[in-house]
Amino acid sequence: MIGPKGARVMIVGDVPNDADFQKGEPFIGGGGYELSKMLQEAGTFREEVLMRYVVMEEGWGSVEELVALKKKDVTGEHVLYRGKHVLPCVVEMVEELKAAIEEERPTVVVPVGNLALWALTGEWSVRNWRSSLMESTLVPGQKVIPTLPPLAVIVQWGMRPIVIHDLKRVVRESQWREIKRVDYSFVIRPDYPTAIEYLAKLI
């Protein structure tokens, strides 16, 4: 993990690539370079952010090697942990992530991958949960805002403004620790006067 003590934001990826290990630093290469630029456009700098992965050791190439995503992939080696069948080493990795968060106490943790999102919240799919204000189930009280992996932006450039939007929310939310959820209330089947009143407010 790299980044300053007392950082308000921690970004957590899934699995390091070869370039990360060669440089000894997370989020290196094209995706990492783009992440640095997007952070700056969102109002912060790479040097102000903690960065790490769930997986912190060499030898693992993908999430599928660690987590049985389909029933047919489950073997005798897998253990049930946080609702997923995983290799035993994943349990250790997630506990190490928990310890790192408890030690550093960032205001917001940003998972940028499905494994990271699951480790922090028990949910899967950053595409479904991106930009959501969530509370960690791994570290209760910890604020979590997922976004897409940097490599997803390289592959699909149209995702770039979306990730920057998410990171801007991260920067805003990093100003306070409380998880301030919006209390949405909906008016279902309003009568005519109520509908006219609401429409007048929109004009």
What are these regions (language model features)?
Residues 1-174:
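A polyanion-binding, active-site-adjacent surface
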Residues 168-203:
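N-terminal accessory regions of nucleic-acid-interacting proteins
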